[in-house]
């Protein structure tokens, strides 16, 4: 398995999430929060695809990959639904950036952080079982 690549992506997510300030005051800070959320979620979706492939599944779209991880018992229903919502937020940030509800996104930061950190923990558990 490509353990190093997983660990690089995990490290990126943890670092990007830790750089998000508790309060944002300026437009550039808001943009930074949006970017770090977007790229953290994207990295989590990359990890999902990598896991699906490395566990013998067929890689599809992000939502299907998350669903496959649920079916394989890697993540539970609650985490799967949370990751799908995160991916929806990522898509919204990418495709509707100029019309994004800033307050809605900022109010979801802590929830997204918690979900991604929970996902990382599950991935680390799986990696430990596969490649101790």
UniProtKB/Swiss-Prot annotation:
GO molecular function list: nucleotide binding; RNA nuclease activity
Protein's UniProt keywords contain ATP-binding: no
Keyword annotations: Hydrolase, Nuclease, Nucleotide-binding, Phosphoprotein, Toxin-antitoxin system
Single GO cellular component term: toxin-antitoxin complex
Biological function: Probable toxic component of a putative type VII toxin-antitoxin (TA) system, probably an RNase. Probably neutralized by cognate antitoxin AF_2432. Neutralization may be due to AMPylation by AF_2432.
Family: Belongs to the HepT RNase toxin family.
Name recorded for this polypeptide: Putative RNase AF_2433
Organism: Archaeoglobus fulgidus (strain ATCC 49558 / DSM 4304 / JCM 9628 / NBRC 100126 / VC-16)
